[in-house]
Amino acid sequence: MVDSHGLACNACGRCCNSAPTLSLRELFRHRDRFVGALTIGRVPKRRIGECWRAGHHGHALDADDVAACDALAERLLHRTGDAEREWIALTLQGYDYPSLGRCAALADDGRCSVHADKPSICGAVPLDPMLPDRLQSRVLAARRDDAAWLGADCIVETASARSFVESSFPVPLVTAGQVVDRAALDASRDALAFERAVWRDAVFASLIGGGQDVRHALSRLAPGGYLTVSIVPVLFAVASVSAHCRALSIGFIDAQRALIGMNIEAALARRHADDRPATRELRGFAQALERARHALAAMPTPAAEQTRHDAPRIEAWLDGRRDGDTLAA
C-alpha cells in the first residue's frame, strides 16, 4: 500500500461535480449561491478487524485505527445511545439539481468563482476531515482511482518522479502516512467542533426528543446512509442565541427563498424530467423557510439577561468577522 501521495491540481473543475458541505458561517457568507440543507447521517462504530473500504480498497482496522476513529467521532459527531453505540453526523450541505453535475460556484470556464473565499472542505479535499489522519493515505488511494475515472489524474503517488499532469510537480499531501499540510483539514474539523455549541447540539437534542416517529426514522437509516431535510431546525437553534443571530437568520431566509425561486425557474426552463424530484424538495424547503420567517419575526426580542453568555463569540463567528477566525481553533 503506497502511503505517500501528492496533488497536481490544474483547476480543471472535474472534481467539483456537486455542491459542497459547508459550515453555517460559510453558508451565511455564500447564501446567494448555495441552497442550504441539513443532512442527518448514520455513522457506524468501527471495530477491530473490520474490513473498512475506501473505494475498491479494503483495510482491516487495527486497535489504533479504531481508537483514532472513536476520538474524532467524540469530537465531531453525536452518539445515538442505542445498543450499537453508533453515531449521528449533522452537517450542512449545499443542495442543487443532481442533473447539473457541477458545483454552483463553478464559472463557465470551469474555474471556481469563490476560490479566494472557498468553503474549508474545498481546501481540505481530497483529504477527508471526517476520517482520522492515519487513514488519509487510504482515502487518497481510493480518490486517485476516482480522479483517474474523471480524467483528472491529479492525485499521484509521490514515489513517482513527476505527475502525468502537465501543470506542476505534485504538492505533497501525505508522506509516509503523515498529513503534510493540515491547515485546511484542521479548519474544517474546527468549524464542525465549534458549531456544536452554535446549533448542532441543540438540533441533535431536538431530534432525540422529537418523539417515537423521529427516533424510528433515524433507526431506519442504513449504516452510512443519510437524510436530507430543511435547514429550518438549524435556523431556529441559531435564532435563540441572540437578537442579532435572529436577524442573521431572517436575512438568510430571505436570500435563500430568492435563490430557490431562481433555481426552480431555471429548472423549469430546462424541462428535464429528472429534475422533478429536486424541484419538489426545493419547493418544500421554500415553504418551510417561509413559515420559519413568520415565526422568527413574531418572536419577542430577548432581554439582555436572557442572551446566552457565548453570544458575542457566536455572533463574531457567523458574521465572518476577523476576530471570529480564531474562535474555532
Annotate each predicted stretch with a short phrase.
Residues 1-329:
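Short loop/turn segments that flank or connect secondary-structure elements
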